[in-house]
């Protein structure tokens, strides 16, 4: 955990290398800073929020996000700390559901249940990020 960072007055987006996956995908970290000095870092592997720095009443930033310090931690550990969840969130009992009279059978990856969309979950995918500094973006 990073602690004791001084607030910056500048807003913007910083892009930097974060690591390489075991599939040899280059992972990029994007750190966004707002006008209040709050910072959020997101990587393009799993769209994971790796850091959230919030200023305290003295203006000192503290990282309040729970996560891992490297790409390897996000690849091999089961908790999806800060990652996008999908195709569904939580468990689907008996890995099946009925919608409009049709029953859909899903992959069982949590005993007899389907957890967070199966083994090809969104948290283990690479995403393509685009930076934008448009107002309200």
Question: Where are the predicted features?
Answer:
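Surface-exposed acidic/polar loop and edge beta-strand patches at domain peripheries
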Residues: 2-137
């Amino acid at each position: 955990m990073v602690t004791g960072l001084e607030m910056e007055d500048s807003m913007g987006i910083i892009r930097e290398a974060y690591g390489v996956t075991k599939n040899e995908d280059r992972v990029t970290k994007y750190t966004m800073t707002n006008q209040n000095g709050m910072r959020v870092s997101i990587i393009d592997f799993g769209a994971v929020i790796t850091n959230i720095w919030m200023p305290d009443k003295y203006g000192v930033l503290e990282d309040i996000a729970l996560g891992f310090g490297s790409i390897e931690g996000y690849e091999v550990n089961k908790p999806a700390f800060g990652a996008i969840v999908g195709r569904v969130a939580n468990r689907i009992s008996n890995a099946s559901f009925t919608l409009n009279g049709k029953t859909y059978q899903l992959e069982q990856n949590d005993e007899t249940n389907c957890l967070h969309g199966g083994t090809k979950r969104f948290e283990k995918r690479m995403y393509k990020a685009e930076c934008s500094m448009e107002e309200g973006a």
